[in-house]
Amino acid sequence: MKSRTRVVVIGGGIAGCSTLYHLTQEGWSDVVLVERNELTSGTTWHSAAQVTNFGMNQTMVGLKSHSIALFKALAENPEYPINYHHGDGGIRLANTPEQMQGYRHFASMARGMDVHFEVIDAAECARRHPLISTENLLGGLWDPLDGDIDPAQLCQALAYHARKAGAEVYRNTPVTALTQHKDDTWTVHTGHGDIDCDIVVNACGYRVNEVGAMMGVHHPVASMEHQYFLTEDIPEIVAAGQRMPLIRCPISDYYCRQEKNGLLIGFYEQACKTWGMDGIDPNFVNALCPDDVDRVMDVLEGAFARMPALRETGIRAIVNGPITYTIDGAPLIGPIPGKRNAFCAIGLRAGLGEGGGHGWLLAQMIVHGEACYDTWVIDPRRFTGHANVELTALKAVEDYQNEFRFHFPHEHRPAGRPAKTTPLTPVLAAEGAEFTVVNGWERVDYIKPAPDFHPTLGFTFDEAFDLIGAEVHAVQTAVGLAEVNGFNRIEITGADRHAFLDRMICGAVPKRAGRVGLCYLLNHHGRIKGEATVANLPASDRGPDRVWYGSAAASEFHDMDWLQSHLRADEDVHLRSLTNDQTILVLAGPRARDVLSSCARGDWSRAAFPWLSVRECFIGFAPATVMGVSFSGELAYEIHVPNAALYAAYLALRKAGAAHDLTLFGARAVDSMRMEKGFLHWKADLITEFDPFETGLSRFVKLDKGDFIGKQALLDRQGKDPVRKLVTLHVDTTHAPAHPGASLMQGQQVVGTVTSGGWGYRIGTNLAYAFVDPAMAAPGSSMMLDLCGDMVTAQVIASSPYDPDHARMRG
């Protein structure tokens, strides 16, 4: 066994084997995999092993598409062939118009990844799968490449090819401890000796937190018992002369695929069970949980109704084994929060079908720092301090119960709520607030007219449309107040704070006390890493000279990791998170200055407190820090208040605002207004696949300043054509917004992908942002938007169509 290697991958299931294989494909041959028992002895061995292209965003579709291509190549390789039923096809069933509408959106989205789904009616479903009844069925989504694979053979093939490329695999080698050294390298202690390495990867399946504990971290992963049945031969299958397509049914929560001349039927029952919450038997190897048929009988009845032939078929085997889930059902692939040189590939509820892509993207992250796709939807840092073991279990149960029910726009499911609140949460609830969830925080979405107001879930504009319009109108004509909680806030102190930020930020860094700037951070490839508001606060009784770095709520762990990883030992720079200590009250509208002047001492005139200023003050008697910034395009102030004084500040603002028709507003109104202004959302419009020039942010880049992260990559690309360009679109329909991922077409060619969409109430226009081919980026260019199957004209317009000179927000 080696005593020194570059990477140690812990875990010999699909995640570990795929990561090892793809590291060798990236040219790293000095890599090792250690497995406590035999390969595939955890969840992998009993996987139903379905392989589909279907995903709810382009990153997931892309990684699954890679899996399919990889598995097909492995199956055709005569050196180590494997059993892969490729191209059986699969149908996701639907019995509501909203489900069918969703499938049309996902087909539009997948087309941009060169993946082609087909939305079919009930009769066509039955034609393609002769066993199913069309009762209570509208249709489904057809994936022509759906199939299944032998999980053990797949992992052995990946390990075989990795070893051939120079990797080593140590079976029956349990990890007993992990030690990280001052230089951020690791020692992996095993039952057969120690291995020193640069990087550790946790790919331990349901034992993820046993290894996590060795690092001093908890991963938000929980295991669920999952059962499937194997039937005896079904005469209709024997007689069919063709393999049956796979079925996934959100109506009755089951899936089925052909297994020999029968079916494998798996269940996602409502009376589901977590597993391993109180620890896992160390001898649970190649093992299963006890059968519990009664628990799935209601689901089985639904399968009987859909496939009557099952009623005459016997069951030859029952499999009940643990599978892992995260808080949102997507895996955790990437850097482990708070740790250097540590990565994970965990929480893989659909590991076999996705595993080729998981290892592919993770290997790119390890070797190159980023993957070819923006991987935020699978990034481990998307969950923060609220993601404890109990909340994870609650969300795992909820996701399991809704396995085949996709999230609709503006749908926020109830389990594990409220996880994060402020003193204003119950106050705003009493005012009629409908809440959305942002990084666990309960944030006001809009104010509803009655407690029983529940808009229809779907892909069209919903019943809240006019309510949101009224909130926007109030902000435009008078003044509005919104709580924006969870906003990521990092305090940066030390003599070298500005030099540090100059190195991190691609543009000008505000350095004068009392001034604020919007800044962008790039990765080493010169592409968008982060967006931050940087405010310079002078020394006061509240603290020394300092910078407040503010960014999106979801970026809390991501941005702290990025900043900390670039601190130098010889720099006087200190970082401290204030995220959970402060909450923002946004005061916006033409009367905002009047309200602020009524409850805070001092001169708040435009001359004394211009746009992009920051000042400490009191709102009433509540200590606050006010910034003159706007995400709405109206005159606005961000009022940052310690949570202990938040209610006092709120009362003072409400009292002062009473004479000015102050109205509460929420996140959906903000989203409408920011689109009219050309303002972008992190991880919607600002992603790691594009640089600031492609994203329309050239004014925030200073190539003539000193070195900064990503500068050389930008210089290297000078003179080269951009891959895509971000544009603003007018969408010619009043029926529905453009949804992220939707494809833009020119004839049969995909020429762009939507990143954001919504109604602009102040200009009366349906708006969208999209990355499009550069040839289509000029104002006036017209293309067709595939909006849930309807082809709608979309025309490029100038960015910031509302008040393009920004006069209103300067006051």
Where are these regions (language model features)?
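Beta1/beta-strand and adjacent pyrophosphate-binding region of the FAD-binding site
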Residues: 2-15, 32
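Flavin-dependent oxidoreductases
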Residues: 18, 177-289, 298-306, 385-412, ...
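Glycine-rich FAD pyrophosphate-binding loop
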Residues: 24-44
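Central beta-strand plus flanking loop segment that forms part of the substrate or channel wall
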Residues: 48-53, 89-92, 217-242, 298, ...
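Dinucleotide-binding Rossmann-like beta1-alpha1 core, especially the glycine-rich loop
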Residues: 48-128, 251-256, 261-262, 290, ...
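Flavin (FAD/FMN) cofactor-binding and adjacent substrate-gating region
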Residues: 70-73, 94-165, 170-171, 176-184, ...
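C-terminal catalytic lobe of FAD-dependent flavoproteins
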Residues: 151, 251, 260, 282, ...
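Glycine/proline-enriched, intrinsically flexible loops and inter-domain linkers
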Residues: 373-374, 379-811
